[in-house]
UniProtKB/Swiss-Prot annotation:
Tagged with keyword Acyltransferase: no
Source organism: Clostridium botulinum (strain Okra / Type B1)
Record field: catalytic activity: AMP + ATP = 2 ADP
EC number: 2.7.4.3
Binding site for Zn(2+): C130, C133, C150, C153
Chief localisation class: cytoplasm
Gene3D superfamilies: P-loop containing nucleotide triphosphate hydrolases
Gene that this sequence comes from: adk
Lineage, highest ranks first: Bacteria, Bacillati, Bacillota, Clostridia, Eubacteriales
Domain of life: Bacteria
Keywords: ATP-binding, Cytoplasm, Kinase, Metal-binding, Nucleotide biosynthesis, Nucleotide-binding, Transferase, Zinc
Family matches, as InterPro entries: Adenyl_kin_sub, Adenylat/UMP-CMP_kin, Adenylat_kinase_CS, Adenylate_kinase_lid-dom, P-loop_NTPase
Protein's UniProt name: Adenylate kinase
Length: 216
C-alpha cells in the first residue's frame, strides 16, 4: 500500500499516520523527519539542504526530491509507505510519480483529510500548554480544572505562537495556495479519496481503514 496523506494544518494527519502505519505495517515517512535525519547524518543531500536552511532559503525541489527518493528505496518501503508532508506542489508530485513509475511502485491512493477552516481555527487556537511540565489542554475539548492553570503542577498555561489566530490563518492560506492544485492533480489521476476529519479519531480512522481496505 503506497499512500500520500494530504490535509490542512490541525487536521490530525500525524495521529492518523501513526495509526495507518501500525495497522498496515508500512513506514510513516515525514519529510521533516527525513530532512532532520539527513542533516544529522551529514549526507551529501543533508549538507546541501542545511546550507539553504541556514541561509533562510527554501530548499530547492531537486534536493527535497532527492532526499525523498533515497528514503523510498530503503528495504522497509518494499511493501509500501505513507508519505506525509510531500509532495507539496504539482511539480513535486510529477517528479515523484515519474520516479515511482520507474521502479514499478506507483501510488495506490492520495488520502485527503478534509476539515473546514472554522473547525481548524477552533481546534488550534484553543490549545494551551503548561510552561513547566508541557501538559496539553484545550479550552473547549479538554479544559483544565482551573482556568489558566495546569492540573498536574499548577503552573501557568500558555498559547504557543504557532497557535495564535493570525498564525493559523496564515498557515491555512499557504496550504490552500499550495495544496488545492495538488488535490486537483490527484483527482485527475483518479486516486484521491476524501475523509471527514471533524469526527472522532476512531471514526476518522475507521473510515480511512475502509478506504484502504478497498484499495488493497
Amino acid at each position: 500500500m503506497r499512500i500520500i496523506l494530504l490535509g490542512p494544518p490541525g487536521a490530525g494527519k500525524g495521529t492518523q499516520a501513526k495509526l495507518i502505519s501500525e495497522k498496515f505495517s508500512i513506514p510513516h515517512i515525514s519529510t521533516g523527519d527525513i530532512f532532520r535525519a539527513n542533516i544529522k547524518e551529514k549526507t551529501p543531500l543533508g549538507i546541501e539542504a542545511k546550507r539553504y536552511i541556514d541561509n533562510g532559503q527554501l530548499v530547492p525541489d531537486e534536493v527535497t526530491i532527492g532526499i525523498v527518493k533515497d528514503r523510498l528505496t530503503k528495504d522497509d518501503c518494499d511493501n509500501g509507505f505513507l508519505l506525509d508532508g510531500f509532495p507539496r506542489t504539482v511539480a513535486q508530485a510529477e517528479a515523484l510519480d515519474e520516479f515511482l513509475k520507474g521502479i514499478n511502485k506507483e501510488l495506490d491512493v492520495a488520502l485527503l483529510i478534509k476539515v473546514p477552516e472554522g473547525f481548524i481555527l477552533e481546534r488550534m487556537t484553543g490549545r494551551r500548554v503548561c510552561t513547566s511540565c508541557g501538559a496539553s489542554y484545550h479550552i473547549r475539548f479538554n479544559p483544565p480544572k482551573i482556568e489558566g492553570k495546569c492540573d498536574i503542577c499548577d503552573n501557568e498555561l500558555i498559547q504557543r505562537k504557532d497557535d495564535t489566530e493570525a498564525t493559523v490563518k496564515e498557515r491555512l492560506e499557504v496550504y490552500s495556495k499550495q495544496t488545492y492544485p495538488l488535490i486537483n492533480y490527484y483527482k485527475d489521476n483518479g486516486i484521491i479519496s476524501e475523509v471527514n476529519g471533524t469526527e472522532s479519531i476512531n471514526e476518522v480512522f475507521g473510515n480511512i481503514s475502509n478506504i484502504l481496505g478497498r484499495d488493497k
